[in-house]
Amino acid sequence: MSIRSRLLLVVFAGLSCNAVTAQDSVDALVERGGELFHTTVGGCATCHGPTGEGLVGPSLHFGPSPVNIVDQFVANPIMIVVTENLNPTNEDLVAISMYIRSLAGLELDPALPSQWRTELVALESLDTEEQEFRRTEYELAMERVQRFDTVVETWERRAIEGSVWSEYPSRIVGRFDAGEPKFTPEPGKTYWYENVGTTSSPSVLFDGYVPPTQNRLVVGDAATHEIIASYAIDENLRSVVHTSAMSPDGRWAYMVGPREPSADGTPNPAGAWTMLKLDALTLQPVVQVTIGARLHHGQVFRDKVLFDTFVRDPDGLGLFLYDPETDEVLGGVRDVDMGGFIYTVWPDHDYERIYAMMEPAGYAPGRSTGMRGVTQIYHGEYQALRPFWIAVINPDTWEVEAEYPIPGYRPNWAVIDSAKEHIYVINSSSNASKVRLSDGEIIWTGGTGIGPYGGSLNADETELWIADKGEGAHHLGRTVTILNTEDGHATHSLYGAYKVDHVLLSPNGEEMWATSNGEGRIYIYDAKSKELIPKIDMPENGDAHGLIWVHYDENGQAATVRDQGNFHNGVNPSLGRPLDY
């Protein structure tokens, strides 16, 4: 049977079982057409807008007939979502066409339905048989596993049974004088913090750009967006910045450190990887502690700080909890117990679960496996990769409670909704998925911009904002894609910074802040109008990663209210608790 036959079979199958006749009133057809037009998945409004005037798809106000629509089913592959999900019958198409005419203000001639039915029957006579092609053994093998359903149906648990908790013997290897405060916080005000590195991309900046040689901690005013102060860290403490993190009480910031120092104070090539603890007022390091891995991301977790890591030492952890009071690694999880490599980790707003983005081993040594795999997909070396998945960790028992494979490669980022019903996963393979947390069911998967990385929900959780970094592809992405969270369709593609990396909703729920580690800037968007408000240049355009907001109450008591992991300390615009500043 030809492709056209299969499509037309769907269209005409309802003729015998759908007893709608020409006597049905025009009003009834229009009403039925409206229901179909606005169906959530597969409905016309998704692409053509609720009025039919066009969104991503063109305007329909010319009044397409049912035959025009069927022609698009055959000729336009994008329309397959309609035939698969809406599955319209002959009478459905008649109703849709009448409804579109009502939207366009065109005449609703009672003779049209009968005319259209005759045209649809005539259309069948134009069908031609589909040609048959020989399939190779490779193609047959690929067909057996090409659908995501086969991943779910054959999934086997990767993690060990029981607790995956392990410990790491952290050591304090450096203490430093905190110095003098660089600014004086005011009661009732909110401040943003940013760790800034030395690895911006000169090619996307101005002629003669010279990168900084020192990492910095920057603090600014959340209301005015202006930088207040910054401090350059000693070059001997330099490493590659990938995150900004803060203790729950807003007193201490954390930054990636080099390997532990040798006798002369320079990093020891054979030493353990370290992290720096910095005073949030003086902006200077006070402690250097071994953590057994190069720091990647960090976020508040209960009264501790949760980190995930890049390169692990032999005894290092893929994720760990850090005690800001005792300055020690309490423990965490090793990759080997998870059955794959931990990339990033994300808690829900109540800290009830930790969701680890997991990578299959073997595409490169150690934790580089996922990045290497997806890079080779973009470069054409690989046609497919082994599955990536989400591991659901109970932080009270430290058992892996569930594993959910995802339809994409190398998950970078995840956002859990305020109801803790769904997790939005953003993949380097230029797609994102909405996953039901109760059972791992994929609600939708939608396309993003090239090589996405970070993401954030808007305040009412109707939009997922995604930073299109170019991860794995070319690292020159410069857009922000916005997806409708109900159906996963893109609604906007915004101009952004080169290598836009993280995007976060501000604590007031009104702005989206996007950090660029290519330009060394922060772009701030109005979350409602989507307009770019200001750009904030980091000192010397050092690369910007992550964001933290710290609020001081009327008594001058500090609290971290937002970081890249979630909102904290009672602030959450999605729960009706925005911070007014």
Identify the function of each model-found stretch.
Residues S25-E31, V41-G43, P50, V82-V196, ...:
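Flexible coil segments in periplasmic/lumen-exposed cytochrome c-class electron-transfer proteins
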Residues E31-L36, T46-E84:
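Gly/Gly-Pro-rich "capping" loops immediately C-terminal to redox-active cysteine motifs
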Residues Y191-P212, V256-G271, T309-R312, A356-L385, ...:
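Short, conserved, GDST-rich strand-edge loop motifs in beta-rich repeat architectures
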Residues Y168-G174, E226-E235, Q284-V289, E328-D335, ...:
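A short beta-strand motif characteristic of beta-propeller blades
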Residues A222-H225, D279-L283, D323-D327, N394-W398, ...:
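Short loop/turn segments that connect beta-strands within beta-propeller blades
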Residues R175-F183, R238-A245, I291-R302, G339-P347, ...:
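Repeated scaffold domains used in trafficking and secretory/extracellular systems
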Residues T515-Y581:
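Blade-level signature of beta-propeller repeat domains, shared across WD40, Kelch, NHL, RCC1
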Residues G188-T190, D249-R251, R302-K304, D350-E352, ...:
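Short coil/turn segments that connect the beta-strands within blades of beta-propeller domains
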